Structures are given as C-alpha cells and as structure tokens.
Amino acid sequence: MAWKTEVNEVSDDIIDGLWSDDPPLQLESVTKIRRITSQRDISCVIRSGVVPRLVQLLKNQVFPKLQYEVAWALTNIAVDNPGVVVNNNAVPVLIQLIASPKDYVREQAIWTLSNVAGHSIHYRDFVLNSGVLMPLLRLLYKDTTLRIATWALRNLCRGKPHPAFDQVKPALPALEILLHSHDEDVLKNACMALCHLSEGSEDGIQSVIEAGFVPKLVQILQLPSPVVLVPALLTIGAMTAGNHQQTQCVINSGALPIISNMLTRNHENKIKKCACWVISNITAGTKEQIQSVIDANLIPILVNLAQDTDFYMKKEAVWAISNMALNGSHDQIKYMAEQSCIKQLCDILVYSDERTTILKCLDGLENMLKAGEAEKNSEDVNPYCLLIEDAEGLEKISKLQMNKNDDIYEKAYKILVTNWFEEDDENNNNNVRCDDVDFQV
C-alpha cells in the first residue's frame, strides 16, 4: 500500500530526528519529509522551518542516500516554491552535487535545479549566475544522466527576456552532439534549447547556423516521431524569422522539399501548423525565396490546408499565402491567382474577431489588386477584381466596414474605393462608410 500522510503538520518526532546526530535517524526523518512533499503537503513542511536543516544535511557527502532524499524533497518544494530553495542557499550546494559520484544524487540535484530555473526568468538567471552551466555540460556526455541534464539545459535557455547569449553559448558544442542522439526525449529537449537560443536575436541565430546545426535539424525533419518533429520545426522556424541570409541558409539546406512532403503526409495538425509557420516566415522574405516555395510545389498544398476545418490550421496556411501576396512579384502573384489563393484570402475574412489575420489578408488582397492593374483586359477590367467577386470577397470586404476595429474598417474602405467605387467628394464624407447597410432595430 502506498504511504500516505495523515497529518497536516510535521511532527516533533520528525523534526527531532532531523536535528539528531544519528545518520540513520536523520535519513528516516528526511524520508518522511520527502514523502510529505510527494503528497503535495508542502506548505506544512515550509511552515515547520525544517528547510534550512535540510540544506545542511544536503552537504553530508559521506551519506549519499541522505543527500538523495533531501534533494528529492527540495525538488518537490521547488515546483511551486522555488524561492524557498533559493533563499535557503540550496542552489550552490545542489550545483556541487552535480559532480557527485552517485548517479542518483546527480540526477536528483539536476532535477531540483531545473525546477527552480524553469519557474521564472528571475530564478533561471539566478541559477545561471550561480555557475550551473559548465558542471551541467560535463554531464551531457554521460548516458546515465543525459535525459534530465538535457531537460535542465532546455530550462536554462528558455524564457523571455532571453538569457544573455554569451552566458549560454558554451552549450552549443554539447547540443551538436545531442542532436545525434537516438533518444526522443534528448532530441526533443536539445531542439527546444536550440529554439530558445535562436529566438533571442539574429546574433543567436547566426551562432547556431555557424555551428552547423541547420543540416542536422533538416535531417531530423525526416524522422517519424511527432515528439521530435514539432521542436525541430520550431527551431527551424525561429531561424527563418531572422534576416534574409539566415532564412536562405535553411532553404539551401533542403528544408522545403521535406516540409512539402511532410504536409502531404498523415501528420497531426500540430505538426502541419508548425510547418506552415516556417513557410510563412520564408514567404515574408525575398522574391527569390518565394520562388523557392513555389518551386517546392507548396502553393497547392497551402491552398488545400487553407480549407481545413481546423481554424488554426487554416489560419497558418492563409498567413503563408498572404505573405506571398504581399512580397511576391507580379508573375508570382499571377501564379497565386491561378492556384485559387484569392479565394482562400477572401474566405478568412468572415472571422471578424481575428484582427491581425484579417488585416494581413486585406493587405495581401490589396497588393494583388495593385498587381492586377498590369493585367487589365481589353475592357480595362482588373482580373483580380473579378476573382475576388467570384469568391464572394466583395461582399465580405464590404461587411468589414461594419467591423468594430477602425484599422479593419479603414483598410476595407480603401480597397473598395480604390477598386470598385468612385468616391464622390461632394456627397461623401471620408468618415462615412461607403456601403450603407440597413440594420433591424
């Protein structure tokens, strides 16, 4: 039967045992404390005032079993109360235990430190500034603690504002080795650590690129495991959010054909959303990069995904399309129109609460209409106006004049006046919406 605490306070016998000079009695009392914290009765442990004594016992190098039980109790306390661990000066002692000769002590110490660092950027920076990184990195070459050490490294890299890049940059060589692991948990956490390192700045992205990670990350995209694919895509997406040269590095590594293949397979939508996000970052780039997306035959795939019943899947696909509409050449926009991209941009306009997405699509449609001026037929008709009308886009844009958001109204108004209606300066005021709608009162 599992041991359960039936008291709401730490007994005097337990406290007396902690302060005893008898190591077996100390161990017995610490084990009881650990069991109480495992039952989530952590507040009574904190109230009892035993944490300073636990930290003292943590220093007992001749009794690793005692150190292990203390570290376990502190691990549980650190989940919701990292300040208790920090304020009782446990972090420096835990960092020393990373070098313990006992695997189980090392692992439990890392777990506690990771819980502290993962709680907030304040505690993350405190643990980093306490000198945890180099001792931790040495453990990344030991199979016995590899999983938890990689998880701890991920926690040390996460959070916004990001840690100072120079402070975590020494982790790059170890992460390069970790990306060759066959352990899914190790790969997942290594990718997420790289993702966090790449999110902070273009300098961070450049360091990751120069360390040679991109080809390996692209190779990981071919693995079947969803556990690994999402972190790998997030990392590549963070890199494509950098400058054009950094985005080009991802393209040159052969990512697009693999992503194209990924989007046509029976992957869960979470993976496909991440893949579309990567594409949208690329289509926000140069015309040459947009052409790379076209050459990878991704436009028909995006059009298909934009019709998905999952709104967030639809949204990510449309975002990639709208970036292309904004940044593409006339020929590329013409190709998009031929692939029914205009309809997908129009269809998303009914989601009236999606301010950012609607504005993005309106910007894309506006730019396509500008490009359509060069494609006018003999009757001086913009062909993209006709395609928008066929997609019921004119009606949807008109209704957006009633949107409560002024930015959406103004953009819709501008598109309508420029492409469909002539503004009569004598009879219309710029503040009057050009599509009169009768409301039932």
Curated annotation (Swiss-Prot):
Keywords: Nucleus, Protein transport, Repeat, Transport
Gene3D superfamilies, per the entry: Leucine-rich Repeat Variant (1.25.10.10)
Primary localization class, coarse: nucleus
Compartment(s) where it occurs, according to its Swiss-Prot or TrEMBL record: Nucleus envelope
Domain of life the protein comes from: Eukaryota
One GO CC annotation: nuclear envelope
A Pfam cross-reference name: Arm_3
Segments annotated as ARM repeats: 39-79, 80-118, 121-158, 160-199, 202-241, 244-284, 287-326, 330-370
Subunit structure, as described in the record: Forms a complex with importin subunit beta-1.
UniProt similarity note: Belongs to the importin alpha family.
Function: Binds to conventional NLS motifs and mediates nuclear protein import across the nuclear envelope.
The protein's name: Importin subunit alpha-8
Lineage: Eukaryota, Viridiplantae, Streptophyta, Embryophyta, Tracheophyta
Gene: IMPA8
